[in-house]
Amino acid sequence: MHLADLMEKSEGGQFLILSHLQQHSPSSLSEVMAETDFSKATLNKYLTLINDKAKENQLALSIELEDENLRLLVGSDTKGRDIRRAFLDNSIKYQLLIYLLYQGQFQAQQLAQELLISEATLGRHISGLNKLLAEFQFSIQNGRLKGPEHKIRYFYFGLLRKVWASADWKQELAKKERQTEIETLEELCGAQLSQGQRLDFVLWSHITQQRLKINACQFQEIEQKMKGYTDNIFYQRLFRRVNQLFSGKHIALSHEDGEMLVLFAFLVTHRILPLHTMEYILGFGGEIGNLTTQLIQEMKMQKLLGDYIEGPVTYELSQICGQVYLFTGYLLQDKYKYQLETHNPYVFSSHDYREVADTIFSKLPIFCQGTALDKKIKWEWLQLMDYIAENSGRQIKIGLDLTVGYLGYTRMTEVLKRYLEYNRFITIEAFDPASDYDLIVTNNPISLTQRIPVYYLKYDLDMIDLANIRHMIYQEEG
């Protein structure tokens, strides 16, 4: 599923234009028309609507037309999730999904009145939405969400993660209940979560709090799939802290196992737990560990792995296996996300592993769902191969030394990460003279005793700088 599938027809068309220009700006009118199949009149209408919507939502975003070329201009403080939300907010399908999350159920007549549409129109939207939700194996029936509970929450996690404003996250993170949950999890892991892990955890917890109001959650599938983990020592430790992990909310005894298994499923598949905790869990066996072992054996047969496998590699493989084992479907940001036909996930590798990926995954049918999750998993596996083959088991570390203030530093970090395809094996941090780096990006004169490549910025970080930085990394590692 693409995010645009949830939008109204006009907004979906506008979002398609935006998505193309985010990848290819500037583009000629003819190129955009060919890419979108819009007539010139429709394209011009949508361009006007995009600029109007940006003004209405106070987004620093505009599309300029000059000499038959379109150029997308986006302010440094404008976030992608704010843009996406602006195009979703008036969508009937999106409003319906949000209503179900926070209200749990609806009466068709009442909801149609609230949305200012007829019951027949509401029925058509529900029917269309159910066709989309089939990818995630749940549906809307009789005014309620019906399906495996872990898959419902997984879908909402993917949706809200793409549209929640910074204020939403800050508000949730500031709640005493969320802080207690984080502290409890950190205590159980014996390690602090990163800020990104905390944000993902509180979002999942927020969704959980809404779903706890539902008395008809279906846990049969997660209980069957995760039955090998109920005796796992880490799971049992989690279970003993059920009150702290669910904000003291009352959970029926018949639902305790189901609720905890859903939380456990999230923790072991979304890169929340630290490496040593995940190794501990995998050490006790279980279905995800077994699938990870199968994948490792197939990779060894292709001579991609030796006898010794580093912890970070096993960790990534376990996350990939956990996702395909427990979940189906994926909500793609746009049609270009994880698009291997036109982009590749490699930063350093000159070798293409796409064919060997097809060979390996064809032997493990669980990796071939026929959903958007296939694309995401294949992309992440190829990123891992890039890391294994070219970096000798070592993460690439980039230091930023910039006199631009906190906001400038944060923006440049986000831009650089976005350009490097959000490769999890590249870390970008504030420059520390006492640390070692593979590359330093700076707009200050730096005197170094050790030989570290330095890229000097003359002005703001632009596309030429980004291309040069990527080239320098490749040259150093290639």
Please name every model-derived segment.
Residues 1-478:
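A cross-family "folded-core" feature that marks the main globular domain of proteins
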